[in-house]
A protein has these predicted regions:
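A structural detector for beta-sheet-dominated domains
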Residues: 36-38, 65, 96, 108, ...
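Structural detector for short beta-strands of small beta-barrel domains
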Residues: 2-27, 82-103, 134-135
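Short, Lys/Arg- and Gly-enriched loop/turn segments at beta-strand edges
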Residues: 67-77, 138-150
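Short, surface-exposed beta-strand/loop "edge" segments at domain boundaries and coil↔beta transitions
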Residues: 41-45, 112-116, 143-144
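Acidic (E/D-rich), amphipathic helical modules within compact regulatory domains
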Residues: 23, 28-79, 84-85
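Structural preference for solvent-exposed beta-strand-turn elements
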Residues: 2-19, 109-111, 117-128, 137-138, ...
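Short, solvent-exposed interaction modules
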Residues: 70-127, 131
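Short nucleic-acid-contacting surface segments enriched for D/E, G, S/T with interspersed K/R
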Residues: 49-63, 120-136
Length: 153
């Protein structure tokens, strides 16, 4: 059963979800978290940046960051992340923010994903909010927990 999304307004670049699992670092793998998102069946596994203090099964707010290998404008399709379970490899969504200094765009793909443009031929200034784009994601997408303000929980 899908749980309804919270309705409290927060920074649109922040992802709001539920912590499903926490995995410690190993010799060949950094620490990771698995998150679920309201109104979706996504279970996204991301590299944890910093200390993730939420309890498993509880709500969590933070920033999902990924490196976009190339960003293409698309005219059809919707918002999605592939695969539904695991580490993201492909993201399609509408642009909700662009940071020309950091060369990032934030996509609404069921949850916000901040994508750093890594193709040297592409700059964030070339993209506009509202455009529908699709990109391949380099391995190693991350999640950084943000402590919510009292009205963001």
């Amino acid at each position: 059963m899908l749980k309804p999304a919270p309705t409290t307004r927060i920074d649109p670049t922040l992802a709001r979800g539920t912590l499903l699992a926490r995995s410690p670092a190993t010799n060949d793998r950094p620490p990771s978290v698995t998150l679920a998102f309201p109104n979706t069946h996504y279970e996204m596994t991301l590299t944890a940046v910093g200390d993730v203090k939420a309890d498993v099964g509880k709500r969590i707010i933070g920033i999902i960051r990924a490196e976009a290998q190339r960003v293409d404008l698309v005219k059809t399709g919707g918002r999605f992340v592939e695969p539904v379970y695991g580490m993201p490899r492909r993201v399609q969504g509408s642009i909700i923010a662009a940071d020309n200094t950091a060369n990032t765009i934030t996509l609404h793909a069921g949850m916000p994903v901040v994508c750093k443009l890594t193709d040297p031929r592409q700059r964030a200034v070339a993209f506009e909010p509202g455009q529908l784009v699709c990109c391949e994601i380099a391995p190693g997408a991350t999640f950084t927990q943000k402590a919510p303000a009292r009205d963001e929980a």
